[in-house]
């Protein structure tokens, strides 16, 4: 049986950078692989699993709520959407249909990076408009405060 590199003509690399989206992010521990395999061979309502894992993680972290996401990009987009949608069922299903007045997301300039996808793109996918504050190597509380306007959502 050919390796994945041979089968798909992939270039094998040595990861000296740590966890990076461009390199597949991580190598799971054996117990994680085992848990995933067990889950893949069972049937259950995904909504129930999402809700219960969120409750479990929130309790572990002692926070109000938590949600498991598939990747950092999804987490950013979903977090922005949650801030904008709040409790509006209509907006939840029509996020990009109508302009949202208060959709600005303030972010220190140095945090607007491309980790496999630009943070600004994820903010836009979540319905937000990115507003950078400060500089790539510095962002003070005053610079953050100056970027906040009546249109700021977060």
Feature map (PLM): residue ranges:
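Active-site-proximal loop->helix
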Residues: 96, 114-122, 145
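Active-site phosphate-binding strand-loop segment of PLP-dependent enzymes
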Residues: 137-154
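Short helix-loop-beta junction
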Residues: 121-131
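Conserved N-terminal alpha-helix of the aminotransferase class I/II PLP-enzyme fold
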Residues: 29-74, 82, 90
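Conserved PLP-anchoring active-site segment centered on the Schiff-base-forming lysine
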Residues: 86-111
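N-terminal "arm"/small-domain region of PLP-dependent enzymes with the aminotransferase-like
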Residues: 1-43
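General beta-strand structural signal in soluble alpha/beta enzymes
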Residues: 14-16, 46, 50, 67-70, ...
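Short glycine-enriched loops at secondary-structure junctions
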Residues: 110-113, 136
């Amino acid at each position: 049986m050919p390796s994945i590199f041979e089968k798909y003509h992939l270039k094998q690399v040595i990861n000296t950078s740590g966890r990076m989206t461009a390199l597949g992010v991580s190598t799971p521990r054996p117990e994680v692989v085992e848990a995933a395999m067990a889950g893949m061979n069972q049937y259950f309502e995904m909504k129930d699993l999402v809700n219960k894992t969120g409750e479990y993680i929130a309790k572990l972290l002692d926070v109000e709520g938590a949600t498991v996401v598939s990747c950092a990009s999804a987490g950013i987009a979903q977090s922005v959407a949650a801030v904008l949608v709040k409790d509006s069922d209509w907006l939840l299903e029509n996020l990009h249909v109508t302009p949202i007045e208060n959709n600005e997301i303030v972010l220190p300039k140095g945090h607007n990076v491309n980790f496999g996808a630009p943070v600004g793109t994820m903010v836009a996918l979540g319905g937000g408009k990115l507003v950078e504050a400060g500089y790539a190597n510095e962002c003070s509380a005053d610079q953050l405060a100056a970027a906040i306007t009546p249109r700021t959502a977060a």
